Amino acid sequence: MKIHDFKIKKQEQKKISMLTCYDYPSACIVAESNIDCVLVGDSVAMAVHGHPTTIMATIEMMELHTQAVARGLGKQFLITDLPFLGHKSSQGHTVENVKRLLQAGAQAVKIEGADKDTCQTISHLVNAGIPVMGHIGLTPQSIHQLGGYKVQGKNSEQAETLLQQAATLEQAGCFAVVIECVPQELAKTITDSLVIPTIGIGAGPGTDGQVLVWHDMLGLQTSFNPKFVKKYFRAKDHFIEALNSYVQQVQQMHFPANEHSF
């Protein structure tokens, strides 16, 4: 998938599938699938490193995981999150951070928020030839300011703000925008108001595409079960079954067998 395909898919009313990915083996699996695009999300800080929020993601962490995913990925378009405060200092510092991610293998970056400074930064990056995906609604890097993981845009004032933010991000040059945890009717209204495609997570079926976290949709963990996640596999259960089978076979001397020995 190439960057121009995002707008083409919206025009042709073909849904976009996006999935997070954080390591080389997972990327090799995704490469053999029909997934359109991959996000090396700052959710790696939680899903892989065990932190309680995405705020702990660093540019070094994002760079390392982007390199790993890029080595294994195939035809999918690769986007990497700019981590917490990665664009809140000088524009020069922001460009340097983005440069590191692109050199690591990313084809675009995703930036959360739509305040004036953020939109100016996005415009600056786009003018420099760097593709940027926006992100509105529940923005995990602002979780403390938002007061927790809550649905956004539930009243008319918040809804109008999100509509304005989406329009501003489009004007700033974003090629797509993620809409996270907003009422489905609002997400559909935002989607219909934009030329660029929207990617939803917890935003209903009316967006131009969907994104889920690898560990969530494969059932690799069971402690975090948001309403918007559908588990397509029970990987944790199968992994535990395999581990226990290995232990049993070692104890009963069924492994290694002759076929596994020299």
Curated annotation (Swiss-Prot):
Gene Ontology MF terms in the entry: 3-methyl-2-oxobutanoate hydroxymethyltransferase activity; magnesium ion binding
Residues annotated for 3-methyl-2-oxobutanoate binding in this entry: 42-43, 81, 110
UniProt superkingdom: Bacteria
Keywords in alphabetical order: Cytoplasm, Magnesium, Metal-binding, Pantothenate biosynthesis, Transferase
Pfam families, sorted: Pantoate_transf
Catalytic residue list: 180 (proton acceptor)
Biochemical pathway: Cofactor biosynthesis; (R)-pantothenate biosynthesis; (R)-pantoate from 3-methyl-2-oxobutanoate: step 1/2
Cofactor requirements of the protein: Mg(2+)
Cofactor binding, note field: Binds 1 Mg(2+) ion per subunit.
Subcellular location: Cytoplasm
One GO CC term, this protein: cytoplasm
GO biological process: pantothenate biosynthetic process
Enzyme Commission code: 2.1.2.11
Positions bound to Mg(2+): 42, 81, 112
Catalysis: reaction(s): 3-methyl-2-oxobutanoate + (6R)-5,10-methylene-5,6,7,8-tetrahydrofolate + H2O = 2-dehydropantoate + (6S)-5,6,7,8-tetrahydrofolate
NCBIfam families per the UniProt record, alphabetical: panB, PRK00311.1
Family affiliation: Belongs to the PanB family.
Subunit composition and interactions: Homodecamer; pentamer of dimers.
Main function: Catalyzes the reversible reaction in which hydroxymethyl group from 5,10-methylenetetrahydrofolate is transferred onto alpha-ketoisovalerate to form ketopantoate.
UniProt protein name: 3-methyl-2-oxobutanoate hydroxymethyltransferase
Lineage summary: Bacteria, Pseudomonadati, Pseudomonadota, Gammaproteobacteria, Legionellales
Recorded name of the encoding gene: panB
